[in-house]
Structures are given as structure tokens and as C-alpha cells.
């Protein structure tokens, strides 16, 4: 068995563990900063709950174990979207289908603005990772629909970056209509969020686990 550290930050350590039976990723909150342990455990619980709800879905990690401190999930081979732009139009078609499946299951990801959370697999298909901020809803409340809408807008922003000519008229209208929550986020929450992630945690804007090593 071999272990590779993918990320170390005040919220814990993320490792890639390779065994004779395959590989898995574990997020270990036991190494979190003493003042942030509660937050690290809460985020780990969110990820575990979301992955449990998505059991059996293709294109997302499979939850292997969670003991309240360490989350283990299957490893999905692939490259972040910003490293390996998709070669075919089918990628964003696949991405939209995957996102709809998440939402039908009652899971909103809430962190899809980061290209590092979108993978391009070896088959040029879409996969989504990092469900720490995900939320679940048994009923499609207005809040859930708003979060799902923002997930969709983030996907379409990436499509606009890499395949702008493939956007439909309806998708362009979605891009032109941010929710009030998005406008409030940009005005009030985004500046302190960027300070925490870039200054306190030292994450580059597009950082994925490999770039966040301490």
C-alpha cells in the first residue's frame, strides 16, 4: 500500500491511498487546526451524506466509509477541467445530465464554480468531485431550487469558457439571470471568502488538491 498526500490545510489532510485492490481518497479531519476541527468534521459529514445519497450514480465518487472523522471515497481518475479542456461537445451534454441526476436525488453541490471540481475522465466524460459544501433536500424547496439553479449557472459558465458556440438560447438566458443570492454573494460574501481561501488557506483561485499541498 502506498499513500500520497494530495492536500494539507487547516481543515485536515487529503490522501490518495493505493492498494492491490485499487485506489481510494481519504479526507482526514484529525489533522485539522484545533480551532477548525468542528468545521472540518461538519464538512466531512456533508460530503459523506451527499455521497451516500448518490450511491450508484456514475460520475461521482462512491462512499466507502465514514466514522465521523475520516471520509473514504473511491478515486476517480481524470484531470481538472482547467488542465484538460474537453475535446468533444459531448462533455457538457454529459455534464448537464449528471447535474440533473444529482438534483433529482436531492443533492445540490454548491461549489461548482471551481473548475477543479469538474473532472475530464480518460474517456473525455464528466465527473464531479468534492462534495464538502453539498446540501441535501428531501423536498424541492425554494432554497434547494435556487441552489440547483446556481449549480446550473456555474456549469454554463464553464461551457461559455470552453465551448461558447454550443450554448443554446435558453442557456444564454440562464447565464444572464443570476439569483438575488448570487448578487448578494458577490457584494457581501465573496470578498471575505477570497481573503480566507487565498490569504489564510493559501489556495490559488483554481486550485485542486494537488495544488493545495502544504
Protein language model annotation of sequence segments:
Residues 2-52:
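ATP-binding glycine-rich loop module of kinase domains
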Residues 30, 40-45, 49-98:
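Conserved structural core of kinase catalytic domains
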Residues 122-214:
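C-lobe/activation-segment region of protein kinase-like
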Residues 33-37, 82, 137-139:
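A short acidic, helix-capping loop that chelates divalent metal ions and anchors anionic groups
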Residues 16-19, 65, 74-75, 119-120:
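Conserved hydrophobic "DFG−1" position in protein kinase catalytic cores
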Residues 51, 99-103, 116:
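Hydrophobic core positions within the conserved protein kinase catalytic domain
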Residues 104-121:
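Catalytic-loop of the protein kinase fold
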Amino acid at each position: 500500500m502506498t499513500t500520497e498526500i494530495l492536500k494539507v490545510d487547516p481543515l485536515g489532510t487529503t490522501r490518495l491511498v493505493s492498494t492491490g485492490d485499487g485506489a481510494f481518497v481519504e479526507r482526514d479531519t484529525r489533522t485539522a487546526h484545533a480551532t477548525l476541527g468542528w468545521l472540518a468534521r461538519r464538512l466531512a459529514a456533508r460530503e459523506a451524506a451527499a455521497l451516500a445519497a448518490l450511491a450508484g450514480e456514475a460520475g461521482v465518487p462512491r462512499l466507502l466509509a465514514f466514522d465521523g472523522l475520516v471520509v473514504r471515497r473511491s478515486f476517480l481518475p481524470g484531470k481538472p477541467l482547467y488542465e484538460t479542456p474537453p475535446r468533444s461537445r459531448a462533455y457538457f451534454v454529459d455534464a448537464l445530465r449528471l447535474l440533473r441526476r444529482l438534483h433529482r436525488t436531492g443533492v445540490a453541490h454548491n461549489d461548482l464554480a471551481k473548475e477543479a471540481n469538474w473532472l475530464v475522465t480518460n474517456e473525455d466524460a464528466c465527473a464531479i468531485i468534492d462534495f464538502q459544501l453539498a446540501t441535501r433536500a428531501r423536498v424541492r424547496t425554494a432554497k434547494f431550487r435556487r441552489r440547483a439553479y446556481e449549480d446550473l449557472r456555474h456549469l454554463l459558465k464553464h461551457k461559455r469558457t470552453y465551448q461558447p458556440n454550443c450554448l443554446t438560447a435558453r442557456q444564454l438566458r440562464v447565464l444572464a439571470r443570476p439569483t438575488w443570492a448570487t448578487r448578494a454573494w458577490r457584494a457581501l460574501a465573496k470578498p471575505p471568502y477570497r481573503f480566507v481561501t487565498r490569504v489564510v488557506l493559501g489556495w490559488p483561485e483554481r486550485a485542486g488538491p494537488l495544488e493545495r499541498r502544504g
